[in-house]
């Protein structure tokens, strides 16, 4: 899905900018003559860590529309758009959620995403490439997968996890900054320039490493969304859709999107730690195994 990349990038940007501004303003009374007041520091980091995460959440739908150039379907202009709207309405009713906004975006890559700050204020969009090359039952399965994300409340859960991660990134970055300032630069009178620079660098590094935790949750939720696609639509169609995506990627179909924003990426080695999606073959096998479970 596209939303994981957008969410992480927005969140990291908000976190770093907030950290810089707060440090320059001297906000946060957590440094005393005896060192850091860890309790006050943790409270301070939790407040601003969750603020950054939820700002990213509330901006996610707007950013997705602007970044991907999504054209909303308010009144279907042809039979394909009418089928798309009718299908999303049907799947939403099955999932027990309000019908999300529906849109398409001009990309030849087979892709789709869902985003939004809650189950009843979401957006589902598909690429023109997917609509043109996939069979309708396969498109329906992909849409069911995305509706599954919305129904499962994945974006809210992701925001809560990201809020916890942000809290500890800010917390440990400031501890590292304080240690460098006091121990290496021997600054005992307030925060020196070493504290500010070290804290910003530590936030960037720790933020990137912490993204592995968020990516691990994202991989887990992909399996759940695949299961939702199989339940709301059809298991066989869900498997065929993944196989078609796998074939396209194996054939080297060019993607205009960065890897973090692709709907169904394949990665290996260390890249798996940062991948927001499991390998396609693992997802296909999980669907097959669940059919016999």
Swiss-Prot record:
Please list the residues that make up the active site.
Answer: 146
Its primary localisation, in coarse terms, equals membrane
Q: How is the cofactor bound?
A: Binds 1 zinc ion per subunit.
User: What is the membrane topology noted in the UniProt record heading this document?
Assistant: Multi-pass membrane protein
A single BP term in Gene Ontology: proteolysis
Enzyme Commission code: 3.4.24.-
List where in the cell it is found.
Cell inner membrane
Q: What class of enzyme is it?
A: hydrolase
Q: Which domain of life is it from?
A: Bacteria
- Keyword tags: Cell inner membrane, Cell membrane, Hydrolase, Membrane, Metal-binding, Metalloprotease, Protease, Stress response, Transmembrane, Transmembrane helix, Zinc
Q: Name one GO cellular component term.
A: plasma membrane
**Cofactors required:** Zn(2+)
Transmembrane regions: 4-24, 38-58, 156-176, 193-213
The record's family statement is: Belongs to the peptidase M48B family.
What is this protein called in UniProt?
A: Protease HtpX
Species name? Cellvibrio japonicus (strain Ueda107)
Q: Which gene encodes it?
A: htpX
């Amino acid at each position: 899905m596209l939303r994981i990349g957008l969410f992480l990038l927005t969140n990291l940007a908000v976190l770093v900018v907030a950290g810089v501004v707060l440090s320059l303003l001297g906000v946060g009374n957590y440094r005393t003559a005896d060192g850091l007041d860890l309790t006050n520091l943790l409270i301070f980091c939790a407040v601003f860590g969750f603020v950054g995460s939820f700002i990213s959440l509330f901006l996610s739908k707007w950013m997705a529309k602007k970044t991907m150039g999504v054209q909303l379907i308010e009144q279907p202009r042809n039979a394909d758009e009418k089928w798309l709207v009718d299908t999303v309405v049907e799947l939403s009713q099955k999932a027990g959620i309000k019908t999300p906004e529906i849109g398409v975006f001009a990309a030849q890559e087979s892709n789709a995403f869902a985003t939004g700050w809650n189950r009843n204020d979401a957006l589902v969009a598909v690429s023109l490439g997917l609509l043109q090359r996939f069979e309708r039952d396969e498109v329906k399965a992909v849409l069911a997968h995305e509706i599954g994300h919305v129904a499962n409340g994945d974006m809210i859960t992701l925001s809560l996890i990201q809020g916890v991660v942000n809290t500890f990134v800010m917390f440990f970055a400031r501890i590292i900054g304080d240690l460098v300032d006091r121990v290496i630069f021997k600054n005992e009178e307030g925060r020196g320039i070493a504290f500010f620079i070290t804290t910003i660098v530590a936030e960037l590094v720790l933020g990137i490493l912490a993204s592995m935790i968020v990516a691990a949750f994202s991989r887990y939720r992909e399996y759940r969304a695949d299961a939702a696609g199989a339940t709301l639509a059809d298991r066989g169609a869900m498997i065929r859709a993944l196989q078609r995506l796998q074939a396209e990627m194996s054939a080297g179909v060019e993607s205009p999107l960065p890897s973090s924003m692709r709907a169904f990426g394949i990665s290996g080695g260390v890249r798996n730690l940062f991948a927001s999606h499991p390998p396609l073959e693992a997802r296909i096998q999980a669907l097959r195994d669940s059919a016999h479970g």
